């Protein structure tokens, strides 16, 4: 049984989260807190497996409460955030301070019963993932923080006009907003490849995600926009709610195209992005699949490898959730399997082959 403590100042939200969580017979809500002070006291008393944490609460906000729970190593914390730009900035601050991951608040933008079921499934799945990691999250976080390199200022902006000869197509999901910092900040600014990243997240969260990632990286990080000409030494991040596609124009330039066809469970989809990159770059594609639930991108890793490209999958040793990389490995789509703290090294080696 997974024991969960809910923290939210809204009685309606506490009730809604309780109903969602207890629809799973293996989850038990052991208590609820209405402010930051209350959740810290109850977390110490109940010793739950997971805490769901609202950000904006009276007396003591969720960010402050989070730091107490993380520093005392009580349990993983799942942030429950409003789907706004302001909510996104605070949520990414929480992830940097040690939160496990985040989910959008149920209600609000949910417009149908099918949407509600999708939101409920995401919350339950992330609670399950957090609970599985209760005893090893702290160890991994200590290791990750210890190995994280100092932020290096960008040495030089990308030089427009350079030909793009190789591409790195990266996919990540659950745990990704935090763990991606073990990879992309280590990529040098002179890397001779364009980089693409799909991270499953709500539309309003992408600008804040890109802003914080860009501040931590040596390479330029920008949100993928329709019509942008692709340059080497730049990381293009797929927008929430839009698929990231590539096309070649008549001049031979690689251009970004966006679409929002509801033909995949996730939008943006790792598979859509990887297949599009493969179509343009063929055997000069490097596929990278990291932590995440499900199998988005697994078949595309197989296709990249069969086309002569290089594929890198995160190992079970470091994966928050081994679903996506594990599926790629099972299908024979991973040439290289390493923990996340070695992925940047393997990307650089692959580009330089």
UniProtKB/Swiss-Prot annotation:
PROSITE patterns: CHEB (PS50122), RESPONSE_REGULATORY (PS50110). SMART domains: REC. Gene3D superfamilies: 3.40.50.2300, Methylesterase CheB, C-terminal domain (3.40.50.180). Phosphorylated by CheA. Phosphorylation of the N-terminal regulatory domain activates the methylesterase activity. Residues 3-120 form the Response regulatory domain. It comes from the Bacteria. The modification 4-aspartylphosphate is found at residue 54. It is an enzyme of class 3 (hydrolase). It catalyses: [protein]-L-glutamate 5-O-methyl ester + H2O = L-glutamyl-[protein] + methanol + H(+); L-glutaminyl-[protein] + H2O = L-glutamyl-[protein] + NH4(+). Keywords: Chemotaxis, Cytoplasm, Hydrolase, Phosphoprotein. Its EC number is 3.1.1.61, 3.5.1.44. Residues 158-353 form the CheB-type methylesterase domain. GO terms for molecular function: phosphorelay response regulator activity; protein-glutamate methylesterase activity; protein-glutamine glutaminase activity. The active site is at residues 173, 200, 296. One of its GO terms (cellular component) is cytoplasm. Its main location: cytoplasm. The keyword Cytoplasm applies. GO terms for biological process: chemotaxis. Belongs to the CheB family. Involved in chemotaxis. Part of a chemotaxis signal transduction system that modulates chemotaxis in response to various stimuli. Catalyzes the demethylation of specific methylglutamate residues introduced into the chemoreceptors (methyl-accepting chemotaxis proteins or MCP) by CheR. Also mediates the irreversible deamidation of specific glutamine residues to glutamic acid. Contains a C-terminal catalytic domain, and an N-terminal region which modulates catalytic activity. This is Protein-glutamate methylesterase/protein-glutamine glutaminase 3. It comes from Syntrophomonas wolfei subsp. wolfei (strain DSM 2245B / Goettingen). The lineage of its organism: Bacteria, Bacillati, Bacillota, Clostridia, Eubacteriales. The gene is cheB3.
């Amino acid at each position: 049984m997974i024991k969960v403590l809910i923290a939210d100042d809204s009685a309606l939200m506490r009730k809604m989260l309780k109903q969602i969580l207890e629809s799973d017979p293996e989850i038990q809500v052991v208590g609820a807190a209405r402010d930051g002070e209350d959740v810290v006291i109850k977390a110490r008393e109940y010793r739950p497996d997971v805490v769901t944490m609202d950000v904006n609460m009276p007396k003591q906000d969720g960010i402050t409460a989070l730091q107490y729970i993380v520093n005392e190593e009580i349990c993983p914390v799942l942030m429950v955030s409003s789907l706004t730009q302001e909510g996104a900035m605070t949520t990414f601050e929480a992830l940097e301070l040690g939160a496990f991951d985040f989910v959008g608040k149920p209600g609000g933008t949910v417009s149908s019963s099918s949407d509600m079921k999708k939101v409920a499934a995401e919350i339950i799945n992330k609670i399950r993932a957090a609970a599985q990691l209760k005893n090893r999250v702290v160890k991994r976080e200590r290791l990750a923080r210890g190995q994280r390199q100092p932020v290096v200022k960008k040495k030089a902006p990308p030089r427009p006009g350079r030909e793009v000869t190789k591409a790195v197509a990266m996919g990540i999901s659950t745990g990704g907003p935090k763990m991606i910092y073990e990879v992309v900040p280590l990529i040098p600014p002179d890397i001779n490849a364009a980089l693409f990243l799909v991270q499953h997240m709500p539309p309003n969260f992408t600008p804040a995600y890109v802003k914080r990632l860009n501040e931590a990286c040596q390479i330029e990080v920008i949100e993928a926009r329709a019509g942008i000409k692709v340059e080497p030494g730049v990381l293009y991040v797929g927008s929430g709610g839009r698929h990231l596609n590539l096309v070649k124009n008549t001049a031979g330039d690689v251009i970004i195209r966006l679409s929002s066809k509801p033909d995949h469970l996730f939008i943006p989809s790792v598979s859509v992005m990887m297949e599009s990159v493969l179509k343009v770059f063929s055997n000069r594609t490097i596929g990278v699949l990291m932590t995440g639930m499900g199998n988005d991108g697994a078949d595309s890793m197989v296709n990249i490898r069969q086309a002569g490209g290089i594929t890198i999958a995160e190992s079970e040793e470091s994966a928050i959730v081994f679903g996506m990389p594990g599926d790629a490995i099972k299908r024979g789509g991973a040439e290289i399997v390493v923990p996340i703290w070695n992925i940047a090294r393997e990307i650089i080696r692959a580009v330089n082959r």
